[in-house]
Amino acid sequence: MALLLAAAWFGGAWAADPLGHFPVDPAQVSVSGISSGAFMANQLHIAHSAGIIGAGMIAGGLYGCAVDSVSEDGVFALASLAVGPCMSVPTLLQPVDFYAQLTADLAAKGWIDPPGNLARSRVYMFTGQADKVVSSKTIELGASLYRTLGVPGSQVKFRDQDLPGAGAGHSWVTQNFGNACDANAKPFINDCRYDQAEELLQTIYGPLQPPAVQPAGRIVAFDQTEFAPGKAAAANGLLDTGYLYVPKACEPGAAERCRLHVVLHGCLQSAEVLRDEFYTKTGVNEWAETNRIVVLYPQAHATSVAELSSQDFLSLFNTNLEGCWNWWGYAGDRQFLTKQGVQVGAIWSMVQRVTGQGN
């Protein structure tokens, strides 16, 4: 397995197998992410609220934050809004009613599920006091939007100034792995003596069994290209290979169905950059092993220098140099935050494949 994963990391000739079906209850699907992955988790949750029961957003996540306007064929979003108001100049953010109306408009067009589905959701949102990448106000507004869209306040857990983990930098926070707690640097996994995976999963699923000391399940590499339009994964910000953690109790043929949790890395955290670090070191797999949760780790792709050389000057503003998930409309995707979005659609197709609802 190590040799096969190495081939996937470095783009070797080896091609991963197709993603398979597993004994997963389609009514027990949830999603989480950090940074750009938090924005994508939020987009998945709101676009597919009929099929996702809960979401966790770490250091990101405000629906439509980079959207300027809506037209008949999609949304008009700006990278300048993403790096400005959404990340670093929160005083320029719109009031929560703007984002609520945007959500209603997209639902009226049939581009996302009716927001009324969100009332049953359970939501975890986190921002660290030392985060120098994404403003805490953005995450705070994201939590407010969930409440405005009908999620009861008791079902929205917003962690910012309160312990544990309050002093975190821009990172997924763990109990015993990663950078110093207040760091804002790769791998963007910080040791704050706080098991974020535990609280996130408990917020969504309720009480859990204690985690495994050493997960006994397996990591499965799978082919992501089949989920991209025309199998053009790289052109749409997707790596050729994604990963899945399968607990021993969730192998095909298991008598009892498991749950599915989708985890989305942030910028500079894909397997291109961190190898297996993100999908093995956040603490999620330990909890998944003992609580019958299959974990899907889709992978984003960073635009390479070679790919840049073939693009015109104006298109450079829509490139993805750090392997981020698409929350500002890069690659010309004007439906990036809806069910028709390339990445949202690809990830949802992966979910349907795992749960046996799709081909």
What do the PLM-derived regions correspond to, one by one?
Residues 19, 68-70, 79-82, 176-178, ...:
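Cap/lid segment of the alpha/beta-hydrolase catalytic domain
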Residues 35, 265-270:
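Active-site glycine-rich loops that stabilize anionic/oxyanionic intermediates
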Residues 149-176:
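Catalytic histidine neighborhood in serine/cysteine hydrolases
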